[in-house]
Amino acid sequence: VIRTVLTVTLAVAILAAAVPAIENAQIQRTETTLTSDLQSVRAAATALAASEDAIEPPAPGARRVVTVDLPERDLSAAAVESVRIDAEGLTYRIVEGPSDTVPFETDARVVVRPRNDHEAITLTAAGRHHLVLSLQYVNATRTVYIERLD
């Protein structure tokens, strides 16, 4: 009986010591994944504006489709509160973790087209979200439009 009690006590102590390290690893993995995906969106906007010709609407201009993957909370990933995309950049918030903004680095104007009356696209559900970036020439200004595909 004493051996069983000691074994259980030792197991609980080891688990209690390991939980903060596991949570830290979850947050770091999620942060790395989000930063990579958001930098891909930024790179697509930059490349689109730098390497393609803008045309006048209503003709469709050059476009790119980029995927942002919000991980679901599990043993290897922390939960994502939100990813917000506006004209300034892309901001993520991790539940009980950090938040950060990846700014756009393009000479073109960036316009976000959300589905509702908001000024930003907000992603909250875990899973893959597809964004369409298109380049148009509006009022003598090269403009990158960003909208959700799904």
Give residue spans per PLM region:
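Hydrophobic alpha-helical segments
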Residues: 1-51
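Short, glycine/small-hydrophobic-rich surface segments
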Residues: 49-74
